[in-house]
């Protein structure tokens, strides 16, 4: 059966380019969801981009797997500042494969075994300053926690002195990328502005920390990811430059810190006020008895915790959209894709599509019983992408989130005000305005 193709309509009529783009600028998530509700493939002009929004799993599989050689990350490169150009986040083909091979050993099962204890220690340390009845921004807390975990486990650093510099960098990066996504124009090197100057000033702060650590690893290697990269060579024996090591570390640093902090923040949000789900979680966590078990065994002991995290990822995927650009004329299903067109796949929209999910807007961890994740067709649920491009650190992120939940929830009850927290899409899906919550210490670990 041919795939439905149509240009997005606004107000019952075919949209002008400016109308569709204005809707995209005003509410990116609603726009993506309406595309999914309109057709399997929606063809729309968004400023400088000729875009196909694809909202069917088998077509997404073609783009990301079977025809992946026809597509590149050029769209992502066009909205990212050049300072990230060499990182795994933006790399294609040989460069991406080379970096991925270098990083894989840092995420092997044996490594995760050593990381788990550090994750638990950092989670314990993160809540030492919490006071019962205190109002806190949980997103800020989770950002600091995941920052400490990533820098300690993967880079062997106590990064407490670099927290503020990192927060300034990520906030500036989010502002810059948001501006580029919302712009009808594409300039690889845009005119300087206060926003771009703030970004590069923040990057210089973090670079000073990064290059100092790289030089130290060259003199005194340790058993961490940075030392692995410093000691790595290509096929002819040439070592990575400091810039290449910095780029590779930055990709892991950003993805491991930013995405997991968003996952944890949204998990606390969907749990707030759900006494029934909280009771089930606490019963499971108390029954598990210890976080010292090997990660694979720990995950196996906490199936309901995994269900809760998967459901939070379904409703609030940190990576809410993936963009690919056609490098040559190709096809997706029955539709021709021209070289230069951008294809967008949206976990946000497809995770909430009533064709694939029962009561898609409802937070229901029980839907994940009986190993639903393994039974779903590819690209029905893809918070970490899928196939060869699946996030190299996805197991790390899920272990990190599991241990944080298992450490914090038995000690503190988290409640949020009745106001709805709106998601703010930029590079990731952050909570707009933070995640204000009241933390109340539990009298016993019930």
Locate predicted features.
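Cytochrome P450 heme-thiolate monooxygenase catalytic core
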Residues: 1-8, 31, 72-78, 95, ...
């Amino acid at each position: 059966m041919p795939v439905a193709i149509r240009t997005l309509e606004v107000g019952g009529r075919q949209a002008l380019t400016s109308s569709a783009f204005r809707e995209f600028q005003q509410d990116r998530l609603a726009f993506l969801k309406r595309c999914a509700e309109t057709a399997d493939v929606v063809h729309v002009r968004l400023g400088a981009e000729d875009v196909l929004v694809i909202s069917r799993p088998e077509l997404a599989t073609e783009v990301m797997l079977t025809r992946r050689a026809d597509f590149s990350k050029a769209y992502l490169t066009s909205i990212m500042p050049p300072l990230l150009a060499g990182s795994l986040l933006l790399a294609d083909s040989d460069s991406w494969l080379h970096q991925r091979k270098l990083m894989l050993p840092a995420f092997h099962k044996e490594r995760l075994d050593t990381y788990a204890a550090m994750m638990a220690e950092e989670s314990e340390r993160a809540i030492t300053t919490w006071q019962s009845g205190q109002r806190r921004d949980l997103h800020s807390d989770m950002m600091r926690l995941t920052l400490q975990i990533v820098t300690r486990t993967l880079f062997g650093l106590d990064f407490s002195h670099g927290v503020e510099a990192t927060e300034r960098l990520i906030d500036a990066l989010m502002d810059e990328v948001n501006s580029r996504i919302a712009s009808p124009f594409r300039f690889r090197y845009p005119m300087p502005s206060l926003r771009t100057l703030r970004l590069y000033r923040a990057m210089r702060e973090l670079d000073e920390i990064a290059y100092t650590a790289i030089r130290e690893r060259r003199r005194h290697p340790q058993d961490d990811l940075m030392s692995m990269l410093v000691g790595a060579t290509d096929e002819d024996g040439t070592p990575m430059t400091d810039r290449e090591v910095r780029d590779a570390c930055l990709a892991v640093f950003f993805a491991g810190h930013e995405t997991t902090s968003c996952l944890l923040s949204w998990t606390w949000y969907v749990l707030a006020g759900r006494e029934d789900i909280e009771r089930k979680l606490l019963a499971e966590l108390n029954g598990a008895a210890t976080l010292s078990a090997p990660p694979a065994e720990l995950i196996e002991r906490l199936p309901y915790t995994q269900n809760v995290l998967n459901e939070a990822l379904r409703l609030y995927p940190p990576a809410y959209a993936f963009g690919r650009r056609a490098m040559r004329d190709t096809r997706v299903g029955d539709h021709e894709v021209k070289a230069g067109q951008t294809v967008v796949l949206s976990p946000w929209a497809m995770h909430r599509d009533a064709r694939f999910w029962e009561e898609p807007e409802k937070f229901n961890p029980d839907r994940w019983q009986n190993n639903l994740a393994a039974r779903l067709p590819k690209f029905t649920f893809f918070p970490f992408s899928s196939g060869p491009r699946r996030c190299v650190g996805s197991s790390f992120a899920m272990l990190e989130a599991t241990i944080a939940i298992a450490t914090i929830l038995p000690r503190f009850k988290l409640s949020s005000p009745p106001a709805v927290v709106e998601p703010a899409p930029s590079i990731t899906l952050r909570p707009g305005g933070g995640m204000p919550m009241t933390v109340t210490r539990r009298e016993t670990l019930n």
